[in-house]
Amino acid sequence: GQFQVRNIYLSVDPAQRGWANEGTNYAEPVALGGVMRALAVGVVVESRCPQVPEGIHLYGWFGWQQYAAVDQSALLWKVDLDIAHEGAWLGVLGLNGLTAWIGLKHLARAKPGETVIVTTAAGAVGGAVGQIAKACDLRAIGLTGDDGKAAVARAELGYAETINYRSATDLSAAVAASA
């Protein structure tokens, strides 16, 4: 069965720029005039699938469009509005947050009291890493490309220190001094 989702929030991600180019990429390019691939949070407004009732909120690859026709075989996640607002499912509770968590806890295996250094500290994944690091009693040093982003990373994203890699005369020395 199929169902129709009305998108409420759409993701805008750096990868989408690459998908707009013709040629070799890790994913098929989006055709000119086609619907841009994107994760979205939406509400089911019509359903011909008993497992997916109308009114339920979902997170999935619905694309940049107001409405998406979705097959029941699509990879979807139910959005629990008791946990967080719909928009959070595109950020810290979605793919960016999952990427941050896996990178920090499962790949880096960072332990409380350790220091981690994060590139693109003010980006979607880097911002989530900073917050998770702080919650896990890690000291996070963030690399950013300008002083405004550095200030946001310190004030809002959990970073103990930040380094503007564009203005640092010796990045290695700046990192060593911060660590």
Model-derived regions, located:
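Glycine-rich beta-strand-centered segment in the early N-terminal region that forms part
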Residues: G1-V12, A20-W64
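Alpha-helical segments flanking ligand/cofactor-binding loops in enzyme cores
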Residues: V5, P53, G130-Q131, A151
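NAD(P)H dinucleotide-binding glycine-rich loop of Rossmann-like/cofactor-binding domains
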Residues: M36-V43, Q51-T120
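Gly/Ala-rich phosphate-binding loop of Rossmann-like dinucleotide-binding domains
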Residues: A100, G130, K134
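N-terminal Rossmann-fold NAD(P) dinucleotide-binding loop
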Residues: G126-G127
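Adenosine-nucleotide cofactor-binding segment
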Residues: K134-A179
